Amino acid sequence: MVGHTGVIPAAVAAVEAVDAGVEQVLSAVERAGGVAFVTADHGNADKMLAEDGSPHTAHTTAPVPFALADFSGRGLRLSGEEGALCDIAPTMLTAMGVDVPPEMTGKSLLA
C-alpha cells in the first residue's frame, strides 16, 4: 500500500522490508524442507512518478514475479511459460497434489 502514497523513500523502505521478510520465510521453508511460491498481484512501486513528475499512485500493468523455491527434494520447477494470475492457484494445487477444480480457468505452470 505504501506505493500508493507516491512517497519514494517510503516505497524503497517498504520494498526492503518485504525483501527481508521473504528471506526469513524462505529460510524457514528451507529448514522445514518445504515448498514456497512468491508472487504479487500487480505492480506499483515500479513506477512512482508520472511523466509530468507528479506522484503515480495507481497500479501498473508491469509483469509480476512468480517464483518457486522447492526445498522438498521433489524436483518441482516452473516451466518458464508465460502465465497469468489465473494460473497461480492451479499451479499451487498441482504442487500439493490436489485436483484443479473445473471452475478454474488457469493452468498449472509446473514443468
Language model: regions and residue ranges:
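Feature captures the catalytic ectodomains and active-site-proximal regions of enzymes
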Residues: 1-111
